[in-house]
Structures are given as C-alpha cells and as structure tokens.
Amino acid sequence: MTTSASLERTPSKRDRDRERDNSSGLGSAGSLPASPQSAITVSPSSPATPKRPLRTSTPSLERKREREDREDREDRKERQERHERDRDHERFAAVFSTASTTVPTNTSSSSGLAPEQLRIPTGAAAFSGFPGLHSMSSLMLPSSAAVAAAAAAPFLPWSPILLPPWNHALLPAAFYPAALRNALPGLFDAKVPSSQRSGFHISDILNLEGSELKNAAAAAAAAAHHGSDLSHHSASESTSGHRGQGSHTSPSALSPTPAGVSADEHHNGSGTGGGAGEADHHSTTEHHAPPSHPQQQHPHHQQHHHPHLLLPQQHHQQAVAPLPLAHHQSGEAQSHAHANAAAAHLLASHNAAAAAAVAAGQYLPNLPKNFPGSFGDEMSSYHHMAQTMLQHSGRSAWIKENELYGTQQPASPDSTSPVTSEVSYTYIGSNCQTSPALSGDYKSYSRSADSDALSVGDALHTLHGSSGNGSAGGAPTAHALHNNNNNTTNNNNHSLKAEGINGAGSGHDDSLNEDGIEEDIDDVDDADGSGGGDANGSDGLPNKKRKRRVLFTKAQTYELERRFRQQRYLSAPEREHLASLIRLTPTQVKIWFQNHRYKTKRAQNEKGYEGHPGLLHGHATHPHHPSALPSPRRVAVPVLVRNGKPCLGDSSKLGADCVSVSSATATAMQNAAAHHLVALNGAAAYQHAAAAAAGLHAHAHAHAHAHGHGHPHAHAQRAAWWP
C-alpha cells in the first residue's frame, strides 16, 4: 500500500522538482544561486543540504525533499521580505541624506565585496564591514550614525522617477545657493548627521577651494586600498558614466544635490541643465586629481566634453534634446539616458526660470574662481543670465527700462562728452516729463545692430557675444553691462558714420523722429567702462574728430519746432533753458536752429514759397496746428480724386465719397509743402505727421503738385515715399 501510494505521488513530485530547478534558479538554501549578490545576502544560519539524485522508491526521501522544498520557499520569502524592508528603509532615509556616495549601477560578476560597491568619501573606512549589496537595493547597515548617508546610495539613480519635486528643486541650488538657503533654511545642516558633516555646509559652494580639498584628501585616504576599483571610478567620473562596466556614478564631494543626479542626469540625460551639473562635473574632476594616476585622463575628457556641454548651455532655454554621448556610453547608459530625458526637460526650464529670477533680483551669484576655467570663457555664466532675461518678455522690458533710464546724465553735459552723448541724448526725451507727448515707447527702441548700437536691447544682445572685444575685465557685475554698452557703441561708430548720416535711408521705427543734426564731436574711446563722462569730455585719452548724426526723439523735435515758430533766433540764456527742458545741450539746440533756418530758407528759394509765412515752417509743423494754415494770398487749389474720378464742381454736386475742396485746402497744402521738403531733403522725416491728416494726403497733394504747380520731378520723388 505504501509503495503504490508513493508511486502515485511520484509524477507530481518529479514535475515539481523540475519546475523548481527550471524557474527559480536559486536552488536550496545552501546551493549556489544565479548571481553572486544573492549568494552573499543568504543568511549564514540557513541549513545547507546538498542535492541528491532523485529516487522515488522510499517515502523517507520524498519527505526530505518536501522538507527541502518548504525550506527553499521559506528562504525565498525571507529574502523577498528583506528586500522590501530594505527598499522602504532606503526610500525614506535617502530623502534626508545629502552625503556624496559612490553607487554601483551594475554589479560586476567578478567581485561581490561591499567596499568595492559603496564608497563614501567622508569616513568611508567605517563601512568596510558591509555584508554586501543585492541588486542595488539591499543594504545591511552596521552603524546607525551612517544610516542617512549609506541608505541613499542605491536610491540616487532612481531619484528622477521616485521624487521629481526634490530632484528639480535641489538641482538649481548648486548654481544659485543663496536662493536655496532662503527657500529651505537649515535643511541640509539639520538633516545630515553630525558625524557625516566633516565641516561641510551649503555655503561652502561659494568657496570650493579649501573645503573641497579637505574632502578630497579624505576621499584619497579612504580609497587608498581600492586600486582597481578607483581606476574604474575615475574613468566613469571623467566620461560621464560608463554605466555598463561595473563602474560608479561620479561622487561630487561638495554638491548638495544627489551625486547620482548631478553626474548621470546632467551628462547622460539633459545636456541642458544650466550650470549645476556642469559645475559639479568639472569641480570634481579638478579636485580629485591628487588621489592616483588614473585621474590623468581628465584633461582629455574635459577637453572632449566642452563642445558638447557649452553649446547647449548658451541656448538652454529651448528644451534641447538630450545628448547621449555615444562614444562614452555602453550597456545600460542608453536606457538611463532615456529614463532621465523627461526630467531633464523640466530641469532645463526650471534652471531658466531660476536664472531669470536671480538676474532680476538684487544680487548676482558670487561665482567661485574655478568657474571660468570650467565654463570655457569668463563671461559664460553671466551671458547665461543675460540671454535668459532677454528671452522673458517681462524681464526684457524691465532691463531695458532700467538700463535706459539708469544711465542718463542728470545735468545737461556738453555735446563733446564721450560715447554716452549718443546714449544719453538720443533717446532721452522719452523720460522727460514736460508734456504728455513725451512718454515714448522704450520697448520699441531696439534697432538694427548694424545701423547703430544706441539701443539698450542691442547692447544687451551684443553683450552675450562680444566678451572678447567688449568688457576689459569681464567681471560679472552690473558694470559689465555698461562697459559693453559703451564699447559696442565705439566699435560700431564706423557703421554709424556710414549709415546714420543718411538719416531715414535705413528704415527706423515709428517711435523715433528722423530729424537730427550732424555735429563735430570728440569721439573718445572710453576704455574704463565707467559709463559716465564729465561735462568737458576730457579724460586724458587721445581725441579724434568725427562727424556723427545725432537723432532726436519726436518729443524733442516737437518742442524745438514749437519754439522755432515763436522765435527763430535764441539768445544764450534762452538756449540753455530750452536745452534743459528737453534734455539736450545748448550746443545741440544752437546747431538745430541754424540747420532749421537754413532748410526753411532753401525751401523758400527753391519752391517759390517766399510769400507764405505760414509755410515757412510748414515741414516742421503739425498739420492741425493753427500756425500751419497757409496764407490766403496765394493758394494752389488741390484736385481731389476718388476711385480715379476727379471731384469737381460746387459742393452741391459732390458725391458722397468726395470731400469738399475748401475744407481740405489747408490740410492738403500743408501736406504738399511737407512732402516737397521731404523730397528735397531725402528723408521721410514727417511721414507720421502727414499720415495724420485725415487720410487726404495721398490724392490731395499729388494732384495739387502735378496739376497746380507742375513739378513732375517732385511728383516722381514723392512716388517713392507714398504708395
């Protein structure tokens, strides 16, 4: 009976053994598992029963096998529960840990020892007794003081997935530590155990030399007995993560951001993450040079990385696709790059916002001395912020307004003051408060950089690309803006001379009036970048004479014309008073009056308007001004045309779409006189004034001059200006 029962149970038992051997790969508690990691984590107290050949003849052997099966299942359950407990413990502890660690991304099959899988630069010798690591997540911690730092190790590469808010909130803090200190006061100093601080605080980022060298020395002492592992580690550190060769994530010894994030996400994932990952990578590669000779790979790899890192960093506002650096990656690196890509885009936008906020605030980041070398050029970080501000509409308006209004001369300096005479006098009327018409639109002052460099927007744009010929010191302060502004104006004076004299020949925008003067000025190369210039313009530098056209705003021209209609000659006190009202110099007012008298006289002689006192100043008068009305002694009647048909006859026979000749005479004559002078002077100075004349200018002045005066050449010249 026993034999038959055992024979009935034999097939099911045999199937169960076969399934167990095929599926689990773990075997009994004492047999060799599939991976060396799981072999290490097996409890040493578990029984080790060797496998015997399968025999089904005796029930005692079957009972032994059943007992072994139960023990195997219990061991598997225990290991699984231990995995779960350790994983949960690591997730909670890693949130409060900022210690820099070295984490295995793929455990090598040749070695399963703990010191080669986990290294902490400060006090690493304390962790030499680790039993082992199991698939990046099983830690058995011998010391409660090291819990926060050690438990974070396997968690760091997963941080973009598990804790996105922490990841993106902490990463910009490496570049702007002051913002983080204000937002999270005392977080890092309070959460890190006292035994793990070793003199590091978040403020040490501002001065990396002393404290990071101390930690680098500690790391060298701790890593002295890890020769082979250090070579892998240094190679991975300088090549942004050889993820597939059992190497480790770069430990940034002083970064408050998680080390796995700073190296893997910034280099593999984004390539656009602002300055944090780049600064961490280069600072660690520089300061870890003392430990051993494999670090000599760093200069090559740094040089190799610059074209990849600096290119997207200058234009990081657009969410650039991740750069997977294929020549440095192998194995798991591709998958990690794809896993970090989504987080990288969020990070880039967050860093852009942080840069704009910092630049628009009251402080600039106090960059450490080793940043220029790692960024590649001295103004890179400041260009980063300036370019960011120009991409945000609210910020660009703010910087233009403050730069425009902050650099004006409080008094009325001489016209021979250096470069700032252009910046201060040309657009200064928009800040004058003497009349409602003086509130100009400073946002539209940006003009083409090749025609002139007066507008603040162009000065800021050229600041981003002209650190070589721009600022002398390249210091990232507010003076760098002004220095580049002045030097850019100096560098473009040749184009000012060539194109600015033509006035309206190059299309300017409507907020500017193209009336102006050409004056002999002392063009001084302002090399000190002070942005000032005293009243006499003598700062000890050699001067050279140059003709330059100074353009006036509409408000300044309007005030000059109004005064010219009242009084054609001004005394010296009157000139000074008028100049102080419209923020010009007395010399500029005098030259403008001289030029205006000459223009009106020449217009009288050439066009035969000697008997028209109202038209003497016609081209400078607003069309609706009372003094703009022509004299009734000599009137040229305009012929109005609508849809190709002349509107003739008395007012009772006029069509609905025709306008009476008598009501349109004054405006038409005003426009006609204005456009004769426009054609003669070769400048479209008063298009905006004539365009305001109730829509009558196009047909009225054309036929008035074509039929009434018979000037075909003037009509042909007007055709170029009026469609």
From Swiss-Prot:
User: What InterPro entries does the record tag this protein with?
Assistant: HD, Homeobox_CS, Homeobox_NK-like, Homeodomain-like_sf
- Kindly list the GO CC terms recorded for this protein: nucleus
Q: Which domain of life is it from?
A: Eukaryota
UniProt xrefs under SUPFAM superfamilies:
Homeodomain-like (SSF46689)
Q: In which tissues is it expressed?
A: Expressed in the CNS and midgut.
- UniProt xrefs under SMART domains: HOX
- State one Pfam family annotation: Homeodomain
Q: Where is the composition biased (Basic and acidic residues)?
A: 10-22, 61-92, 226-235, 278-289
Q: What Gene3D superfamilies is this protein classified in?
A: Homeodomain-like
Any one Gene Ontology MF annotation carried by this entry is: RNA polymerase II cis-regulatory region sequence-specific DNA binding
The places in or outside the cell where this protein is found are: Nucleus
UniProt-recorded name of the protein:
Homeobox protein vnd
**What is the originating organism of this protein?**
Drosophila melanogaster
The lineage, from the top, is: Eukaryota, Metazoa, Ecdysozoa, Arthropoda, Hexapoda
